[in-house]
Amino acid sequence: MRPSNRTPAQSRPVTITRQFTAHAEGSVLVEFGDTKVLCTASFEEGVPRFLKGQGQGWVTAEYGMLPRSTHSRMNREAARGKQSGRTQEIQRLIGRSLRAAVDMKLLGENTIVIDCDVIQADGGTRTAAITGACVALVDALNWARGKGILKTNPLKFLIAAVSVGIYKGEPICDLEYIEDSAAETDMNVVMTETGKMIEIQGTAEGEPFTHEELLSLLDLAKHGIREIVDIQKASLS
């Protein structure tokens, strides 16, 4: 039995609130249960130096956690003077995932900067961030089209993400912190709205997992992401 009494395939309640802040071209508060992440998308003219003159755009991401998003306060990374390896890994994952969803040629020489700030953490912050950031990205692209900056929508498809893992010997979907911290296997899966894979990050924290367990985890992720995409679409309708 899971601590929350959810079934193995049951995700936490997911809520997406658009236009959460006033200034960003796209802004979303995404909630996976008690995990809450603010995602903003800023549309900027120009591209990084390595892309100048190539007629294509760029999507990049930054990720951070507020000092009291966790049970005990942690120092801001800015105060420590450097980002942790975890932070760098997560923001690269978010950026890679979102770039897969955008036609960079249609974006033109423009950049979209995604900022994901964890307000409250209870497991699955990176998957919640990807899910919310995708909706913020859609709003930023629609803003640019409304301003006449873009003539064609560069979005190829929606993407979403969910965590899966093996907890007490059983594959489960959307781990909260108490499950994540004790899981034998922990995996993060990013998919398109049609169920194609973008990224799979999986680690045996305890016992190695079998091929059959891997397939079970991917099936759980596909089911969970399908439900999350439906919530994304409802929020955008």
From Swiss-Prot:
Biological process according to GO: rRNA catabolic process; rRNA processing; tRNA processing
Reactions this protein catalyses: tRNA(n+1) + phosphate = tRNA(n) + a ribonucleoside 5'-diphosphate
Keywords: Nucleotidyltransferase, RNA-binding, rRNA processing, Transferase, tRNA processing, tRNA-binding
GO MF annotation, one: tRNA binding
EC number of this enzyme: 2.7.7.56
Keyword ATP-binding applies: no
Highest taxon listed in the record's lineage: Bacteria
Binding site for phosphate: R86, G124, T125, R126
Residue runs in coiled coils: none
Function: Phosphorolytic 3'-5' exoribonuclease that plays an important role in tRNA 3'-end maturation. Removes nucleotide residues following the 3'-CCA terminus of tRNAs; can also add nucleotides to the ends of RNA molecules by using nucleoside diphosphates as substrates, but this may not be physiologically important. Probably plays a role in initiation of 16S rRNA degradation (leading to ribosome degradation) during starvation.
Oligomeric and partner information: Homohexameric ring arranged as a trimer of dimers.
Family designation: Belongs to the RNase PH family.
Protein name: Ribonuclease PH
Species annotation: Shewanella piezotolerans (strain WP3 / JCM 13877)
